[in-house]
């Protein structure tokens, strides 16, 4: 058998194997969703065989095209191939079908695509997380009860005065009120199959972290904006004293308004300890310039220090745009933790046991007490400030 016939036979056999393996690959994907390692190995071997046969065929074509056997008479590849076939003919009548090696290998599904494995980036890409800051402004405490009661002085009428001998002394008056801060629960849960939690241990820690973050994010909003109705906390903005707009002067900027609010806090005999702003409002204030185009609050360094009028600025999206809160927060309010944020996993929830499901619960219990609401000032920026 001639060299050309041997190459042709090898190519035909490899193509038949490749077709069979492609059929097997399709069947595996439909049944299991993936391709077995053994099948991948077989495909690689057949691919190598086809590559070798193609190389041999190319070399033979070059050899015949160059007329190496008879330098004086160059013949085309088809002529040389015909001569090779005639030499191998045994004199019997028959037909012969010649197939060319024209199946190129590519990355499509019908070719070698299943052999190309995508690179897996480890871990889960997490979205951006908001920095949580409101709790850090407040005093902290722990309680073992479901409610807190405290007595708050409301009005002190101070009539103290100098008194002449034998004269009637003046009487002063103090009014108190009993306040109650009930412990509230913040919670949420997700369900997951036991199989996925067993097969992907990393997923469990990821879910736990996301649940804890979601809890803290809700707490942030409650500490600042809770309206106190139903099971909501009574937040700082709910109990805050309204900003005294009579302090405003013509031409005041937002920075001036914050300065007025700081002064208003001092009227309660306390000192402000922080400023809570929406990030957009802080951005606008930090970029304020004087008449000569110079930055008032330090220019590019303003966002590094987050300081205005000597007080830390707390930019948070929990604060509505156009709203500001200034206060002596550590003296005015206190967070009381009844139960720290915890994560629990249960199989006994509803029909979890028979469905191999897990319920992952995250919750905390806390109360928020406000001792001195006059030390917290809340207001809004005017449209022209």
UniProtKB/Swiss-Prot annotation:
Which spans of this chain does the record mark as coiled coil?
1-57
Specify the cross-link site (Isoaspartyl lysine isopeptide (Asn-Lys) (interchain with K-169)).
Answer: 356
The Gene Ontology biological process annotation of the record reads: viral procapsid maturation
State a GO cellular component annotated for this protein.
T=7 icosahedral viral capsid
Task: Give one GO term, molecular function aspect.
Answer: identical protein binding
| Keyword field | Capsid protein, Coiled coil, Isopeptide bond, Late protein, T=7 icosahedral capsid protein, Viral capsid assembly, Viral release from host cell, Virion
UniProt keyword annotation of Coiled coil present: yes
Show the cross-link location (Isoaspartyl lysine isopeptide (Lys-Asn) (interchain with N-356)): 169
Q: Known InterPro entries for this protein?
A: Phage_capsid, Phage_capsid-like_C
The record's account of how the chain is modified after translation: The major capsid proteins are covalently cross-linked.
**Superkingdom of source:** Viruses
Function, in words: Assembles to form an icosahedral capsid of 66 nm, with a T=7 laevo symmetry. Responsible for its self-assembly into a procapsid. The phage does not need to encode a separate scaffolfing protein because its capsid protein contains the delta domain that carries that function.
Q: Which NCBIfam families match?
A: major_cap_HK97
Q: How does it assemble?
A: Homopentamer and homohexamer; isoaspartyl lysine isopeptide-linked. Interacts with the portal protein.
Into which family does the record put it? Belongs to the HK97 phage major capsid protein family.
Please give the name of this protein: Major capsid protein
Organism listed in the record: Enterobacteria phage HK97 (Bacteriophage HK97)
Its taxonomic path starts at: Viruses, Duplodnaviria, Heunggongvirae, Uroviricota, Caudoviricetes
């Amino acid at each position: 058998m001639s060299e050309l016939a041997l190459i042709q036979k090898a190519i035909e056999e490899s193509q038949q194997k490749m077709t069979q393996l492609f059929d097997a690959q399709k069947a595996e994907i439909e049944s299991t969703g993936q391709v077995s390692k053994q099948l991948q190995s077989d495909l690689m071997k057949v691919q190598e065989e086809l590559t070798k046969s193609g190389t041999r065929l190319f070399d033979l074509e070059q050899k015949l095209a160059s007329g190496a056997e008879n330098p004086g008479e160059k013949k085309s590849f088809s002529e040389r191939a015909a001569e090779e076939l005639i030499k191998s003919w045994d004199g019997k009548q028959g037909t012969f079908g010649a197939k060319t090696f024209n199946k190129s290998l590519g990355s499509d599904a019908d070719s070698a695509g299943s052999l190309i494995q995508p690179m897996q980036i480890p871990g889960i890409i997490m979205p951006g997380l908001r920095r949580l800051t409101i709790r850090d402004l407040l005093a902290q405490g722990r309680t073992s009860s479901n409610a807190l009661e405290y007595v708050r002085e409301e009005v002190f009428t101070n009539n103290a005065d100098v008194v002449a001998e034998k004269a009637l002394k003046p009487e002063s008056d103090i009014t108190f009120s009993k306040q109650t801060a009930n412990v509230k629960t913040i919670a949420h849960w997700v369900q997951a199959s036991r199989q996925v939690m067993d097969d992907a241990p990393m997923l469990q820690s990821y879910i736990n972290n996301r649940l804890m973050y979601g809890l803290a994010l809700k707490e942030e909003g409650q500490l600042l904006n809770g309206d106190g109705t139903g099971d909501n906390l009574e937040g700082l903005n709910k109990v805050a004293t309204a900003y005294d707009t009579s302090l405003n002067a013509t031409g005041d900027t937002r920075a001036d308004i914050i300065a007025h609010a700081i002064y208003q806090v001092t009227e309660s005999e306390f000192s402000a300890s922080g400023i809570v702003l929406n990030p957009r409002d802080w951005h606008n204030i930090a970029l304020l310039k004087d008449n000569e185009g110079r930055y008032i609050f330090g220019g590019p360094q303003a966002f590094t220090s987050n300081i205005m009028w000597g007080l830390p600025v707390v930019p948070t999206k929990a604060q509505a745009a156009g709203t500001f809160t200034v206060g002596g927060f550590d003296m005015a309010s206190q967070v009381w933790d009844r139960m720290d944020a915890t994560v629990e996993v249960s199989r006994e929830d509803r029909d979890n046991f028979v469905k191999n499901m897990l319920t992952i619960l995250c919750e905390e219990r806390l109360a928020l007490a406000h001792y001195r609401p006059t030390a917290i000032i809340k207001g809004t920026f005017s449209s022209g400030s």
